[in-house]
Curated annotation (Swiss-Prot):
Family annotation (SUPFAM superfamilies): Glutathione synthetase ATP-binding domain-like, Phosphoenolpyruvate/pyruvate domain, Phosphohistidine domain
Cofactor(s) this protein cannot do without: Mg(2+)
Record: residues binding substrate: 532, 601, 703, 724-727
Parts forming coiled coils: none
Protein name according to UniProt: Phosphoenolpyruvate synthase
Organism: Synechocystis sp. (strain ATCC 27184 / PCC 6803 / Kazusa)
Entry EC no(s): 2.7.9.2
Length: 818
């Protein structure tokens, strides 16, 4: 401990101490050392015994800053500078900021402050076995404002950070620059914007032992999903080298989601892994003129994840520990924004900063606000969406911060990346688009905080979008955001959840896109009645499972090349690509609604649709009528497909057994006979999905007349039914729903179809089996939903956009029925 090197300051003297060690401060000391340093001290004191590694160090106090300002007589001079400041006048702001910083830099530290810093740095050198000569121990010097990291406002990046500082003279110079950084243009603007008095804020400087992540990796993590506010997932970003590139958005990092509830139970629930380009890394400038420099990352390193699964899980565990601790200290749920680093010399992971998250934690959980784009046009750029909203205006392409005076309020900012110097104009933008950055970069954090839609990591937006052209930025269509040409029509819907009634009938949701699942988690639904695997396979996997299993036998050279590129991380085991991607997609949906039931329908492509997957034509027959051909259950046990179905089973088993998401219920589609059902269940058992084991239930789609007529027999095989009204309608009426010639006859409200539905519900209930519906009918026709409630159906699964209005209608029906 540091106490073996220096004496700890007594409580009585903390208020007037110039230096305090991290071990001496905690969350109650924000006024003394700022949010950043008090948080480091809190973690060192309270969490190291729980296995959380935090590098040690010391802080200059807020008292030291005020003492410096007072001793030098600077306060009145600074006040005079800001008497008639106009923060919206960029030239005025830049001039006043420059004069304020120069005033501080031109004024030397008092001798006793220099001595205090020198003694503390000397003690750190001694602690790490180095002498304080021309060089000493390498440290990070970071500013920490006394108003920083309060939960209501993020001052992230408002002041300066200096890495690889390794001599006393450099430490003193960096501390001086940190003091001056209290008056950077962005900090002045930010305080004004958030209503902070410039002179009520003081500055503390943290001097912390460097973690040698220049030789390894680093990143940012949040103990909450930054986009949707979903509380049960930790988001981790990672890139090579020092962490500044991730924070500033200079690099597109890898991203990982981990599910916190089952992680705490000992499972390994990595929900998603997304590879970033990681083109550059920040390293020590050994022998150079600067402290750090950026170098290119070698191609093989870019094309693999930069931390392994155990490190992902370890970081997520720490995120849980840190969040739980701060929530306990504050007496209210407190999601955290955390910076981490891996030491390349020791292989150890460290937490180097932690602060309360400042956007999602402030939002009302009782209002759902959704944006719907009504038109589409040419797509100019795509990237990661930030904030599920839509913005539009004239594009302003700004390639350098020196050009920000060209920006006008209401324009769409298009740039390479942002850092805190850009903030004075960011708050004036209707939307922000950057070439670089991930979901935790500076542009993303500030855009979220200001409620501005942003798209980051586009790659080439500054080339494909021209200054002056009208654009619409859409972040409401999932994880990928799009920049559209022109001003497009859109609608905004707001729903107050606190007044919604509860219904006896379970209201479930149909969810296909895993990227939207966290956003749907706040809807008033009792789970998922239909999670479609087709979306995941078509959009995330893209290749036919047999094309992955028999890659060397592929005859189509174009498909083979595309699959090779798609699966380059899996060159030695391409089927694992299918299992990983499918498991991640299922897990994202299951986690969003955990522990509520999530019914996952096994793949139900028709043979012509399977053929359209990469490499698929080689493995699929040409059928005259694929709608009623080789689909659903009949494929799963067929010698020509069973090994591909095994991959689906492996993915499902991983989600349930390794991730702990036992709320997943597999459902078999298009099962023509009870005997066919038994064959499929036997096939699943071969791959570890044994009915009844670990609470596993298996449902069947009730979508064929035979499912209804033989419902007693199907009840002996399956644990529940879900009526598929689309197929049941076409097969009851004997028509092809894809044919425009007979489309006018397709109607779920037909008396014959309704009798089928009635018979299915009555037979299932007589056999003690659950029965719901997941077809389109209840979403499209409120009177059909009423019909189902009157029959006593257990659950109705709806499209997300129908949930709210249908809940109200069903509540009325239930009330009328008494």
């Amino acid at each position: 401990m540091v106490s073996s090197v220096v004496e700890k300051t007594s409580v009585a003297h903390k208020e007037t101490a110039l230096i305090l060690w991290f071990e001496e401060v905690g969350t109650h000391d924000v006024g003394l050392v700022g949010g950043k340093n008090s948080s480091l001290g809190e973690m060192i004191q309270q969490l190291t015994n729980k296995g959380v590694n935090v590098p040690s160090g010391f802080a200059t106090t807020a008292y030291a800053y005020r003492y410096f300002i007072q001793e030098a007589g600077l306060e009145q001079k600074l006040r005079d500078l800001f008497t008639d400041l106009d923060v919206n006048d960029m030239a005025n702001l830049q001039e006043r900021g420059h004069l304020a910083r120069q005033l501080i830099l031109d004024t030397p530290f008092p001798q006793n402050l220099q001595t205090a810093i020198a003694e503390a740095y000397g003690a750190m050198c001694e602690r790490y076995g180095q002498k304080m000569g021309r060089t000493g121990v390498d440290v990070a010097v970071r500013s920490s404002a006394t108003a920083e990291d309060l939960p209501e406002a993020s001052f992230a990046g408002q002041q300066e950070t200096y890495l690889n500082v390794h001599s006393l003279s450099c430490v003193l110079e960096s501390c001086h620059k940190c003091f001056a950084s209290l008056f950077t243009d962005r900090a002045i603007s930010y305080r004004h914007h958030n209503g902070f008095d410039h002179f009520a804020v003081a500055l503390s400087v943290g001097v912390q032992k460097m973690v040698r992540s220049d030789l390894a990796t680093s990143g940012v993590m949040f103990s909450i999903d930054t986009e949707t506010g979903f509380k049960n997932a930790a988001l981790i970003t990672a890139a090579y080298g020092l962490g500044e590139n991730v924070v500033q958005g200079a690099v597109n990092p890898d991203e990982y989601f981990v599910f916190k509830p089952t992680l705490k139970e000992g499972f390994k629930p990595i929900l998603e892994k997304r590879l970033g380009s990681k083109a550059i890394k920040m390293v020590y400038d050994v022998g150079g003129s600067k402290l750090t420099k950026n170098v290119e990352v070698a191609e093989p390193e870019r094309e693999k994840y930069c931390i392994n699964d155990e490190e992902i899980l370890q970081l997520a565990r720490w995120a849980c520990i840190i969040e739980d601790h701060y929530s306990g200290v504050r007496g209210v749920y407190t999601p955290m924004d955390i910076e981490w680093a891996k030491d390349g010399q020791t292989g150890e992971l460290f937490i180097v900063q932690a602060r309360p998250e400042t956007v999602q934690s402030q939002k009302s959980a009782n209002v759902i606000k959704t944006y719907e784009l009504k038109d589409h046009s040419q797509v100019l750029a795509t990237g990661r969406s930030v904030g599920a909203a839509i913005g539009q205006g004239k594009a302003q392409v700004i390639r350098n911060v020196s050009q920000i005076n060209q920006f006008r309020p209401g324009e769409v900012l298009i740039t390479n990346r942002t850092d805190p110097d850009w903030e004075p104009i960011m708050k004036q933008a209707s939307a922000i688009v950057t070439n670089q950055g991930g979901k935790t970069c500076h542009a993303a954090i500030i855009a979220r905080e200001m409620g501005i839609p942003a798209i980051v990591g586009c790659g080439d937006a500054t080339d494909t979008i021209k200054t002056g052209e009208d654009v619409t930025i859409c972040c409401s269509e999932g994880d990928e955001g799009s920049v559209y040409s022109g001003i497009l029509n859109y609608e905004v819907h707001e729903t107050e959840l606190s007044n919604l009634p509860r219904t006896k009938t379970q209201i479930l949701m149909n969810v296909g896109n895993p990227e939207q699942a966290f956003g749907f988690a706040s809807y008033p639904a009792d789970g998922v009645g239909l999670a479609r695997l087709e979306f995941i396979i078509a959009n995330h996997i893209k290749a036919h499972p047999l094309a992955l299993m028999k890659f060397d036998e592929l005859e189509d050279p174009l498909a083979k090349a595309e699959i090779a590129e798609l699966t380059k991380l899996y060159a030695g085991d391409r089927p694992r690509f299918f299992v990983d991607k499918l498991a991640h997609g299922i897990a994202m949906i299951a986690a969003a609604f955990y522990p509520k039931p999530v019914v996952v329908r096994m793949s139900d492509f028709k043979s012509n649709e399977y053929a359209n997957l990469l490499g698929g034509r080689q493995f699929e027959p040409k059928e005259e009528n694929p709608m009623i051909g080789w689909r659903g259950a009949s494929r799963y046990y067929d010698p020509n497909y069973r090994e591909a179905y095994a991959l689906e089973c492996q993915a499902l088993k991983r989600v349930r057994d390794e991730m702990g998401l036992t709320n997943v219920i597999p459902m078999i589609p298009f099962c023509r006979t009870p005997d066919e059902g038994r064959k499929v269940i036997a096939e699943m058992a071969k791959h570890g999905l044994k009915q009844g084991k670990n609470g596993l239930e298996i449902y069947v789609m009730c979508e064929l007349p035979s499912n209804v007529i033989l419902a007693d027999e199907f009840s002996e095989v399956f644990d529940g039914f879900s009526i598929g009204s689309n197929d049941l309608t076409q097969l009851t009426l004997g028509l092809d729903r894809d044919s425009s010639l007979v489309a006018h006859l397709f109607d779920e409200r037909n008396l014959g179809v309704k009798r089928m539905v009635k018979m299915a519900i009555e037979t299932a209930k007589a056999n003690g089996r659950k029965i719901g519906i997941c077809g389109q009918a209840p979403s499209d026709y409120p009177e059909f939903a009423e019909f189902l409630v009157e029959l006593g159906i257990d659950s109705i699964s709806l499209n997300p956009d129908s949930v709210l209005k249908t809940v109200l209608r069903i509540a009325e029906v239930e009330k009328a029925l008494g």
